[in-house]
Amino acid sequence: MATAKPFPLFATRGDDVDPEETQEWLESIDSVLRVHGAERAHYLLECMIDHARRSGAYLPYSPNTAYLNTIPVGQQPDYPGDRGIERRIEAYIRWNALAMVVHANRKSSEYGGHIASYASSATLYEVGFNHFWRAPTAEHGGDLVYFQGHSSPGIYARAYLEGRLTEENLNYFRQEVVGPGLSSYPHPWLMPEFWQFPTVSMGLGPMMAIYQARFMRYLEARGILPAQDRKVWCFLGDGETDEPESMGAITMPVREKLDNLIFVINCNLQRLDGPVRGNGKIIQELEAAYQGAGWNVIKVIWGYRWDPLLARDDKGLLRKTMEECVDGEYQNFKAKGGAYTREHFFGRYPELKAMVANMSDEDIWHLNRGGHDAVKVYAAYHAAVNHKGRPTVILAKTVKGYGMGEAGEAQNITHQKKKLDEDDLKQFRDRFRLPVTDEQIRDLAYYKPSEDSEEMKYLKTRREKLGGSYPTRRTRVDPLQVPELEFFKGQLESSGDREFSTTMAFVRILTALVRDKGIGPRIVPIVPDEARTFGMEGLFRQVGIYSSVGQLYTPQDSDQLTFYREDKKGQILEEGINEGGSYCSWIASGTSYSTHGVQTIPFYIYYSMFGFQRIGDFAWAGGDSRSRGFLLGGTAGRTTLAGEGLQHQDGHSQLVATTIPNCRAYDPCYAYELAVIIQDGLRRMVAEQEDIFYYISVMNENYAHPALPEGAADGILRGMYPLRTGGKGKLRVQLLGSGTILREVLAAADLLQDKFGIPADVWSVTSFSELRRDALDVRRWNSLHPESERRVSYVEKTLAGRQGPFIAATDYMKIVSDQIREWVPGRYSVLGTDGFGRSDGRDALRSHFEVDRKSIAVAALSALAEDGGVDRKTVGDAIAQLGIDPEKRNPVTL
């Protein structure tokens, strides 16, 4: 048997100085392969490389293999399906997916949609649907699949064949308001019984899938889930890998040995505007990255029509040419047809041109790529699900817009293609041999064979063997018993002389929860390498830090009470300096009721500045996912985290939280407020299973905490309650505060009374956003029911009859407290921390941002003057008396 020269090695390193010696070495390896197999050959080669390096030879490491399929023809398993029937089913789905998008855009070009992405990946999905992806049943938890967002039309088209969606549903693709429509992309919020995971914007799916696979192992290790052979599949595009989130976490699943994780990257070589790597090879680039990280890499580049040509490639010229061509050329080979490919690919060497001399231009154009060959794809999937010890990535080469012909196949404009004319549609029909008439093409009629047809029976039988229809999503599970408010008694009582922060109050609440025999095992504490910052190190010993391998070393602080304890059954997810990954773990835990049929309750605590601001897109996806859990913004408040300065001081997380519709945001000052909020959150999310989540800002400032006032719990949850009533007086002001600035508000009330004889009522506002949410809802109802009795919002009802003016101060931007201006029954002045943060002590910072007690008092006096309660000279005298510089620059400009 002739042995081909190895490429690209010789193609890039010059001529072989001793071909005879080279041939002897190659024949030796051939002999080992024949007699002892590939594993022995691999072992010998590794030993030789190691020996050469130890002997002083410089051997640069290359993580790339030849530009060929990883699985040779001889190692492909038998295909278990009927390819004839499967081709027809795939063709019907292709047609219906295309018709759905074109139909919508015939109505209006506003709707958009994507044809080309699913066209390139249809075979990748169909092999999975027919042979691999198990739906959840009573006996098996089911596989989890992150579908590439732009391929949603194909998933809908399959569901239509299965009878899960109707023709009316398809007709209302991307029209969810006016009819029974389908969401543009996978959105559990919009289709809660269909889609499991939101995968757009691009790049979110890969990281979420990684942490989902790890969380599955976490649940198994802790005995919450039975150990099963479930897999997490993630589909993404080659262009999508440019997103930092797509590649940023790929070393973690190798460390964790997540062989339950499979990535399928659809390498159609094109992104939205043009080639992904026109001057290079994206498959080789991705192979190097994943191989270097330690993944099992399977390349599916060439379809079966190339196999005979490769078998005849005795001199290695075909493989050499495959290596030499860049992706921009490969795109042209499919866009410009067989004659072009004959000239520019096979025409590089006379021997190659002779190899295809008996092939027509059409034959050459039909030389297929691996991602469109079900047998090659099945071989890759089969190898992936059976691989042990490492995650697998499958790099499947496809053609973007496959089947669209001149309308968009392999063309740069194909991603934006929403419409096809009648001739294009006929060409598509003929190419896939669809039983669709010219009249049906004009009408864009969907095709669905009869229920007793061979195809429909096959389609349903395959899914029945895999547990049922897919995708599918659970919406409710058995509720857990939630502790009553009295459970948190220690935080509801006065602390006396003891001073501590709301962060420490949270840690005590969390510690009590993990100790509870009922709900405790389902609590999932998540920290991004800040447990000691937040005073949580006591939990290290108590519940342990999860580690898939346990603890293989003696920790440096093993002689301490709170030593760093890692354990296979550890409860804490210690994610390192990694807010994106931490949040993905939070999503995995917060959706476990749906993905795994068991409730877990994540508590993710982090520097508040590095939350929504850092991973806002993931936070939005968390809301879309219907995640349930708690986000704790630690060291919150622009002046409360004093010395850390500009990049750390958070003055807007409470505002950003309001942008996510199902997020409930609170800014408590006292331990009892925090306890009331967390207990009610558990009740709503865990017992009543509402699809909401909580953002709570907690601080690192120590002070004494009073007891829960009688009757205050309802006001705490609704957003505000009266904390202290001022004495009698002709004039009066209402002071509102939240978080630690509430204490400055209380001090300002004392100052107003003591120095100026003006009493003040003080209100604790735990959530301006909840007050606004209620008020907007009431306003809307009143607007739509003009003849009904007018409803009154909670904030209006609470402040009705109060003698003003009203002054609000927070440690956040002024717009946070400004949210309720419309419903405050009097003059309303707001103070906040607009501007960049800076390093200094709390007193200095509060003076700088004008949220200290003196500034609050002056704001109150100024408002009284505007209302005619005091003269302006009184305000001027107060400014001088309190030592405030009226000419200092506005802090927002500094």
What residue spans do the PLM features occupy?
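Thiamine diphosphate
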Residues: 2, 19, 175-198, 204, ...
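Non-catalytic terminal/interface segments that mediate subunit docking, oligomerization
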Residues: 76-97, 118, 133-136, 143-144, ...
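A structural-propensity feature for long, helix-poor, extended segments
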Residues: 234-235, 241, 617-638, 643
